[in-house]
Amino acid sequence: MSIIVGIVSEFKKFDADLKNPNWSVSSISSNNELIVSLWGHKPLIFKHPTERKQVYRDRIDRWTGNGRNEFKKNLAFALKEKLKIRPIIAMLDKSSDFQNILDGKDGSQYPKKFNAKTNWIGELTICDGIQFEIVFQFKKFIA
């Protein structure tokens, strides 16, 4: 399966379409939720120290590629409208490549797999235009 087919099919699980499957990493779903592809590698995602949650913390200025501006706009909209956030976790085929991503390389150039986390619901807890943090809670079943 190609990377494009993989990401498109994972967004469909949330009833969301990508504006451009070649570079989009976020979308507002028909359920008015922000659907976003996020890296599943530490240090960006980690377990909450005391609660059963996952925390994703990143900087928009670290992102490269055409999807950055669309993501920034969608993130601001999610903050303003208090949208729930639903993740699609991207995992590199070679985790050793992740340092390149942290160093600012374009993540679209690396082979990866996508996984829609349909039992995670997130809330934007920090968003200042550069830094952002999303805290995800787990649900056993989401209707």
Predicted regions and their residues:
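Short helix-coil boundary/hinge micro-motifs
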Residues: 1-142
